[in-house]
Swiss-Prot record:
Its cofactor is FAD. It catalyses: (S)-malate + a quinone = a quinol + oxaloacetate. SUPFAM superfamilies: FAD/NAD(P)-binding domain. Belongs to the MQO family. It comes from the Bacteria. PANTHER family: L-2-HYDROXYGLUTARATE DEHYDROGENASE, MITOCHONDRIAL (PTHR43104:SF2). Pathway: Carbohydrate metabolism; tricarboxylic acid cycle; oxaloacetate from (S)-malate (quinone route): step 1/1. The gene is mqo. This is Probable malate:quinone oxidoreductase. Pfam families: Mqo (PF06039). One of its GO terms (biological process) is tricarboxylic acid cycle. The lineage of its organism: Bacteria, Bacillati, Bacillota, Bacilli, Bacillales. Disulfide bonds: none annotated. Keywords: FAD, Flavoprotein, Oxidoreductase, Tricarboxylic acid cycle.
Amino acid sequence: MSSIQQKTDVILIGAGVMSATLGALLKELAPELEIKVFEKLAKAGEESSNEWNNAGTGHAALCELNYTSEKADGSIDISKAIKINEHFQLSRQFWAYLVKNNLIQNPQDFIMPIPHMSMVQGEKNVSFLKKRFEALANNPLFQGMEYSDDPEKLKEWIPLIMEGRATNEPIAATKIDSGTDVNFGALTRMLFDYLKTKDVAINYKHAVEDIKRTSDGMWKLKVYNMGTGNIEEHIAKFVFIGGGGGSLHLLQKTGIPESKHIGGFPVSGLFMVCKNQEVVEQHHAKVYGKAKVGAPPMSVPHLDTRYIDNKKSLLFGPFAGFSPKFLKTGSNLDLITSVKPNNVITMLAAGVKEMALTKYLIEQVMLSHEKRMEELREFIPNAKSEDWGIVVAGQRVQVIKDTPAGKGTLQFGTEVVSAADGSVAALLGASPGASTAVQVMLEVLEKCFPQRMAEWEPKIKEMIPSYGVSLMQNQELLHEIQRSTDEALGLSEKELAYS
């Protein structure tokens, strides 16, 4: 049975952090817009945004070594780190605005202060880390970073990691106290609670099955109502496809030229979680290592203090897995049905070029619990097998596209694909993902509502004072933003409470 629904201004597909952020921005900028949300699951933030399905790192390039590469001349390129840090500052400002205006409450339920650290072993890696520290230390965005290769100092910083460790190999770490742990699931749920108060119609258990352009340039969505069994038709002027791994299939259904020659490759993630609370309490940091030679960027190992359900947890990973599903709740046919005549060459080219990734995934899938424990013991030498279990994290669909570098190039970032007229946009990709949600959704606004940006700019700057400004070039504004966001999000006093 099918029913025709009324037209609406905006439809958001997927109730994850991206749709939540875009909805919140739009309701603050243009409260008159009528917005509908369709989510096939029963609650918000249950796929990639869920707290158990991602690392929960507030990605600001404070500790992630893959954001600072070593150039041929041995110098360190920090341009990507600067960009990611500035993007995270935008998120902090928007969250602080929402808290200060009482639009969301209890920020401690979604963001906690935690030192961010990088740790490496071996002479070559120690040399790299020292050069990285020297390249970042005087940059105002990375103020307060410390470096040490003294084992006694490292025992103060990371006692659990140093206990039982042989000291015959060089080891070094950097530490910066302004890092954060972010519960993106809790944040997503808060944002949707706020959107409900703004008369946004949030429809759970509604699966979008098709999306087609109408003769008058609008978009008609075929939506399956899982509660009634009915097929509904909804029409909107603007559609945002924020369905995580499910976005690629829906983007392909739009038929827009920009959707061609794009593929996706799913990578699943596993984390080890500590079951011994005594061990959990011995560690207080997010410690990122260096990916092994030949391993993809998403394989960077890290040992993380997390705050989930107001409880301190300890996770290690990620370990990669393979499933043809594009979502944890997806279908085993997702990968094969994403291959179309316009992207088959792109996908095949990637298959040939990415043999190292294929080999890595096969090796990861074959790992036993004890083999994973061996990798964990590179971080915690005294780790006991019985103290650690496995949690299956979310699916990440890495974008494959044709670039100037050649056909079938695997992308490791987050990417907005939009129609030339701005009437539809989709978010594809993975890391740094949710941390940059505000920057990415501002990009959606710029691409899809260019005629309204001049009108909206004063309000955007009220919410996000550094919008359009380089904080690295404006230290006074940077320090004011850091102070005000720390205060609004309660980060300063919480750090004192947990240190």
